[in-house]
Amino acid sequence: NAKVTGLDLSPYFLAVAQYRTRQRHYDINWVHAAAESTGLPDASFDLVSIFLTCHELPQIPTMEIFAEARRLLRKGGYFAIMDMNPNSENFKRMPPYVLTLLKSTEPYLDEYFTLDIEQALVAAGFNPPRIRENSPRHRTIIAQL
């Protein structure tokens, strides 16, 4: 009985999402907005999740998204993040030339890799998060309000 809302800044991605939603007969409310300022009502969600987003952004918008997630969540709600894991052995062992190539396609990777995500979430008002590896290069972060 969950009500699902999806959000994206790209009208093109939203058009694809709406098309696929209709194909599968899902009931999802798609919203065109920036994750930092959704315009959605305060305390209206039990779960907010973002997927492979933080590494695409500078630290300031990332922290703005954390604050927006906190605003959107009801007390006791969860914020789930899945993204690259800067502590991954795969990244640590990556030859410098490969890492340089990766960074050429990921301009904010250094900012993401230096972000203390646990501290940033606590500073945004969340309880200390649980962080788990979910693949050789990715992690899931769960923070409760």
Where do the language-model regions lie?
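C-terminal lobe and adjacent flexible extensions of AdoMet/dcAdoMet transferase-like proteins
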Residues: 141-145
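Class I SAM-dependent methyltransferase SAM/SAH-binding core
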Residues: 1-37
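A short acidic, Gly/Pro-enriched loop at the edge of an enzyme's catalytic core
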Residues: 36-48
